[in-house]
Amino acid sequence: MERTLFAATALLIATAAVSTAQEANAPEQAPPGDPFVQVSDALPLPEFIPGLGTLFVDPATLPAGPFLAYDHDGKLSATVYMTPLEELQNGTAYDDLATASDTVTGVDIYYNAGHPGVDKPHAHVVLFHDPDAKARLAK
C-alpha cells in the first residue's frame, strides 16, 4: 500500500512537470492577487510557515492546491501541493495541477498528519523554483 502511495505521488510530480508548459506563471512578488488568498488570513496558521513560507491559495483548488509559497522578502520560491493520503489510496488522481513557475530546481515530498485547512493526513509535495529557495523558506 505504501509503495502505491509513493508511486502515486511520483506520478503527481511527473504530471506537474509535464503540465508546466500549459500553465501561466504566478507573480514573482507577493501578493499574487485574485483569486488567491493568503492562507494565514483564512486559517489559524502563522503568516510564515518555516519550510513552506508565506502561502497563498485559490480556495477553488483545495485541498491539493497549488499553494504559492513566498519567502520573507515576498519572492516566489515554491509551489506546494497537499494531497490527502486517503484520497490517493482510493484512486483519486490530481491531474493537470498548475505550477507557479516554469523552473523547478528541486522537489521535497513528506508526510503531514494534518493541520487547519487540510485536516486529514496528507503528503506535502514542494517544487522549489530556484537553487536557494529551500534555504530561504527554512527560517
Give names to the regions the model predicted.
Residues 1, 11-12, 134-139:
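Contiguous hydrophobic segments
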Residues 2-21:
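Gram-negative bacterial Sec-dependent N-terminal signal peptides
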Residues 21-139:
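Metal-centered catalytic cores of metalloenzymes
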